[in-house]
C-alpha cells in the first residue's frame, strides 16, 4: 500500500467527548480522549501539531463535528 500521509489522525466525535487516534507509518498509534469543551479542543490541536500531524479525518455524525472542525481547520487539513 502506498503511504499518502506519514502521520494522520482519525477522530470519532460524540456529544461530550471525542476519541482521537494518531497513526504513524511505522504502525504505531496513540489514542487519546478529549472533551468537546474549547480548552480541550485546543489541547487536541496542540497535540496534533506537536506530533507533526497535517491531516485529520473526522467522523461527522450530526452536528457534533462542527466545533472540532472550527478549531482544527486553520491548523490542519480536515477531511
Could you say what each language-model-derived stretch is?
Residues 1-79:
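Phosphate- and other anionic-substrate recognition elements at nucleic-acid/protein interfaces
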